[in-house]
Amino acid sequence: MTNQQKFDRLRKLLDEASVYARAVGKLEFDMQCCAPKDGMEQAGVDMAVLSDRHFRLTHTKRYAQLVTELHADSEELTPVQKKVVEHLYEAWEKEKNIPAKLNYEMSLAYNRAYSKWLEAKQAADFSLFRDSLAEIISYTHKALDLRENKKPTYYDALLDDTEKGGSIAQLDAFFDALRARIVPLVRRIQAEGKPIRTDFMSRPCPIPQQEAFSRYLLELEGLKQDALVLMTTEHPFTTNFGPRDVRVTTHYYENNFVSNIFTTLHEGGHALFMQNEPEEFYREHAANSMTNGMHECISRFYENLIGRSEAFVHFIYPKLQELSGGTFADVSERQLYEAVNAAAPGLNRCNADELTYCLHIMIRYELEKAFMNGEITVDEIPALWNRKYQDYLGVAVPDDAQGCLQDVHWTMPAGYFPSYALGSAYGVQILRTMEKDFDVFACAAKGDLLPIRDWLKAHVFSIASVTTPDEWIRAITGESLNPDYFLTYLEKKFSALYALT
């Protein structure tokens, strides 16, 4: 049998396994968007059964033989097929010792955790989620203990899963660099910065008008509307089941219209990635293999670098006035720009400004690193969270809902949060390169975001799933990730915004 014939057989197995993966994803989407509370337990069981079927299909002797043989000899395969085999082999090496029973139990635990988190958040009571989080940590440790190629710590292993090649040493250095320049800038703004008007930010804006604006923004970003759906959820996310079925979610607050604007732009960035990977990637099962940091790069790019720019605020200002029906008639374009960029330490990560956002990420990074590595207990999380928010941001956390329960991420294995900060830094570096090819902000000022989408499609989306993070950013920009570009961008922008001398 030729190697191409072997890959053809492997592809058929992956085609079948993908049916179960998509079914799980659709049930999860329903659970987070529209399933009744009383139906969540059954949905969780259904998802675990389907996950078990997917697991068994990708852990047969035939599957293992095809993957290992092709990994040893990939002659005849296309470059994309070779990358697929490489990804599958890495996953196989990590999962090959996990019994099906353990995988099923882990799936049940993760699915139960979501409903427990939602209940706990609504009650503002961490104790209702405490046992689920402890269970997730325990199962994660069990699965990682079965790996043959051990990392220095549990959290190092999780970082390598989410950011290929990522490690505590790498991220400690990255966050040290950010902390050294962001914290002094925040303090300077608090001590010397000019006042910025934000009183109008809490004016009521009817949800139907916010929804209409969301759809308008998604169209501006260049998303294919017939391949997309927009819904609401407690904690916004975007998922997809191929390039022609992308699901975007947001959350509307009547007294915080800005939250939805930037959530929509953020999630729309994820959706653009999903709609614009090469067809070959989907056909050969390479799609969606990029790291979380690569994905968050694009969502943060549209949310902040485009969405909060003077150019884009100039464009959307008249549309916002039109849709709001006079609610913001006394607000000038400049006042809107300053308000959506105002740096004010607060409680909520999702609604954080561009400057203090990374401090929110550092807190989560430090906590999940500690609880995954057994340095703190689950019971210590709420108090430590509150203390870190006081130390880093100078704010008092009133309850668990606005504290350690605000994010959905700990209903799954830890390690995702650093991706947001990495993505922010990647984005600025990519923008510097993009600006060499065309006037990005002249396009944004006209509301013409299609050249941006097309450039990203050609230079970013086209290689992400078949490269490591370092290969990817070097291919796009000519150098490895350099956080200095991100920090210089923040210093320049916020010094000008607050008239710092």
Region spans (language model):
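C-terminal, non-catalytic "cap/extension" segments appended to globular domains
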Residues: 2-6, 22-28, 38, 42, ...
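All-alpha helical catalytic cores of prenyl diphosphate-utilizing isoprenoid enzymes
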Residues: 175, 179, 207-211, 217, ...
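A well-structured
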Residues: 1-166, 466, 491-500
